């Protein structure tokens, strides 16, 4: 499963171009991090095109066989914690 995370301090936000492509009114609109449209934009245009000010959005791939996942955040910097076969991992 692919998920979009912010990998810098500051916070998750979109560029004006990404907002327009996604039909969002605000750079700070919350959408599912595994939204197919968002994943497609990241794959087609890349992080710099999609990321807003003070954001460095990245595409993270976690195993499809994970049984649970959760996003962890500190001051805008995010990571995914997920479970596979009863073991915890992070990305």
Where do the PLM segments sit?
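Catalytic phosphate/metal-binding cores of nucleic-acid and nucleotide-processing enzymes, i.e., regions
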Residues: 1-91
């Amino acid at each position: 499963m692919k998920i979009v995370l912010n990998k810098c301090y500051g916070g998750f936000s979109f560029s004006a171009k990404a907002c327009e492509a996604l039909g969002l009114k605000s750079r700070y609109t919350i959408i599912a991090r595994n939204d197919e449209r968002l994943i497609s934009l990241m794959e087609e245009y890349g992080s710099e095109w999609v990321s807003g000010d003070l954001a460095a959005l990245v595409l993270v791939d976690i195993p499809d066989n994970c049984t649970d996942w959760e996003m962890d955040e500190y001051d805008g910097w995010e990571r995914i914690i997920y479970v596979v076969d009863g073991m915890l991992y992070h990305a």
